[in-house]
């Protein structure tokens, strides 16, 4: 029976009961009100008491004033030289260089005006008067005009390298010209009809030296002259002055001809062969 009544009450969704439930929920619980009755009137406006706050602040801030509470961090910036910190020294150096090269710093350093004072003395009794003139030079123009690039000093020593090369070149050219001249002279002599002074030959593979000088004999006569067998009776076969009765190109025949002339058989018919 109790179970059935409980189920009926649970399934009853009438409005008056809901209102009663709402009233019960809206009423504050008794235990909460009892707890609040123990508080002072000042506690309803502030969360913390001012007297207790000072004690808490002193206790909480005690560790801030104590310097020994924190461990000391050892740094070597002031002890070691700047070589052990290349990054910081490099950054500082670059910063100083940029500051020196910046146009703002140049304008600041060169913004001062130069004052020149000229004194003009007069010969009268009034003495001398000084006139001060203030001239402000333009900063950018003074920086640009005042800068002068260092010029390299020219050496005063004589530069004979090119001259020597020119002399050698001209000497080589002159030597080549002389060789050409000698070759042209020999060619001109052949063209003009050089002849052997002994046999009168005009064509020969090589001109040789003779009693009159170099290149005065043909090849055959020059060989005979060098060996000491050049006689008036000797004539090459191709010589234009060759005569079979008086001349020969064989040394043995020339010796026989001379024996006949010495015996007296051909004294009347002998002619000068020289």
Curated annotation (Swiss-Prot):
GO cellular component: nucleus
Motif extent (Nuclear localization signal): 152-159
One annotated GO molecular function: zinc ion binding
Region entry Disordered, spans: 1-39, 102-132
Domain of life: Eukaryota
Pfam families: GATA (PF00320)
Ranges annotated as GATA-type zinc finger: 190-244
GO biological process: circadian rhythm
Tissues and organs where the protein is expressed, per its UniProt entry: Mostly expressed in roots. Also expressed in stems, flowers and leaves.
Stretches of the chain forming a coiled coil according to its record: none
Location relative to the cell: Nucleus
Gene3D superfamilies given in the database record: Erythroid Transcription Factor GATA-1, subunit A (3.30.50.10)
InterPro entries per record: GATA_TF (IPR051140), Znf_GATA (IPR000679), Znf_NHR/GATA (IPR013088)
SUPFAM superfamilies, A to Z: Glucocorticoid receptor-like (DNA-binding domain)
Entry keyword set: Activator, DNA-binding, Metal-binding, Nucleus, Transcription, Transcription regulation, Zinc, Zinc-finger
Function: Transcriptional activator that specifically binds 5'-GATA-3' or 5'-GAT-3' motifs within gene promoters. May be involved in the regulation of some light-responsive genes.
Name listed for the protein in its UniProt record: GATA transcription factor 1
Species of the source: Arabidopsis thaliana
Classification of source organism: Eukaryota, Viridiplantae, Streptophyta, Embryophyta, Tracheophyta
């Amino acid at each position: 029976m109790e179970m059935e009544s409980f189920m009926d009450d649970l399934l009853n969704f009438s409005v008056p009961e809901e209102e009663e439930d709402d009233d019960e929920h809206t009423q504050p619980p008794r235990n909460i009100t009892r707890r609040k009755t123990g508080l002072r009137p000042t506690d309803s406006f502030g969360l913390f008491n001012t007297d207790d706050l000072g004690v808490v602040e002193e206790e909480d801030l005690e560790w801030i004033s104590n310097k020994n509470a924190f461990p000391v961090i050892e740094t070597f910036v002031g002890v070691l030289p700047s070589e052990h910190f290349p990054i910081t020294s490099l950054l500082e150096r670059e910063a100083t260089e940029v500051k020196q090269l910046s146009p703002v710093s140049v304008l600041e350093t060169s913004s001062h005006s130069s004052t020149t004072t000229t004194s003009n003395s007069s010969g009268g009794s009034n003495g001398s008067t000084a006139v001060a003139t203030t001239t402000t030079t333009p900063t950018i123009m003074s920086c640009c005009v005042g800068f002068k690039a260092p010029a390299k000093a020219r050496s005063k020593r004589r530069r004979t390298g090119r001259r020597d090369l020119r002399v050698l070149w001209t000497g080589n050219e002159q030597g080549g010209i002389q060789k050409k001249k000698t070759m042209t002279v020999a060619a001109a002599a052949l063209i003009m009809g050089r002849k052997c002074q002994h046999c009168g030959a005009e064509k020969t593979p090589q001109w040789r030296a003779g009693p009159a000088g170099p290149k005065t004999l043909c090849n055959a006569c020059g060989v005979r002259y060098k060996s000491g067998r050049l006689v008036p009776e000797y004539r090459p076969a191709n010589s234009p002055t060759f005569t079979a009765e008086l001349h020969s190109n064989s040394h043995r025949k020339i010796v026989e001809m001379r024996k006949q002339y010495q015996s007296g058989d051909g004294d009347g018919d002998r002619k000068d062969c020289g």
